Amino acid sequence: MMVSCMGSLWVILSLILTLISGFSLMSSAWYKTDTISFGVFVHCIGPKNMPCNQTCIYYRTLEEIPDIFGKIAAVLLFGGWLLLSFGAVLVLSWTIIPVGLCQRRVCTPARYAQISAVVVTVLGLLVFPFNLHSEFARQICGSSFIYKSGDCCLGWGYMMAIVTVMLSCFLPFIGRYNLNEIKTKILLSKM
């Protein structure tokens, strides 16, 4: 089976954005100072110019995350990543399904999974800065407050998550264009 240009773009972007999103979730560089950085599932202590000398603590359960807003953000962001991953698996499986209407049964749920992933991830990204009001964040960032980072700087991990979700907004549209392309090919082949 030959995959269309838009179909190839949809598959490649879905897989790449899923990987980048997962990588940014596991990053400790969401908010940082010179010696401490913290993210959704990890925080590291040590000089940032010497990453080999940093000590990192990974949160394995929700109870280990220090603040309720951190827990809510973790659930939302992880849920968004799972939906994005599920959509990427569906899109990837679409490439091996034989030509026909069965493709539509995979493409449409993939698009809905990707739309849901974007919505849930945006909510998680909006909730995470509420974590700055916690006692944990105030110990690191000084006089931090909701959406005010105090002595902390915004890190590349948080920015990468924002850029990834912005690019993920295009995935359902690419999938819709791809589905229209499939329908056109089916109609033309029956004529």
From Swiss-Prot:
List the transmembrane segments.
6-26, 72-92, 112-132, 154-174
Name the keywords, alphabetized.
Membrane, Transmembrane, Transmembrane helix
Please give, as recorded in its UniProt entry, the membrane topology of this protein: Multi-pass membrane protein
Task: Please state where this protein is localized.
Answer: Membrane
| UniProt main location, coarse | membrane
Give all cystine bridges in this chain.
none
Q: Give the domain of life.
A: Eukaryota
An annotated GO cellular component:
membrane
Does the keyword field hold NADP? no
Per its UniProt record, what InterPro entries does this chain match? LHFPL
Give the family from UniProt: Belongs to the TMEM211 family.
Q: Would you tell me the protein name for this molecule?
A: LHFPL tetraspan subfamily member 7 protein
Which organism is the protein's source? Answer: Xenopus tropicalis (Western clawed frog)
Q: Which gene encodes it?
A: lhfpl7
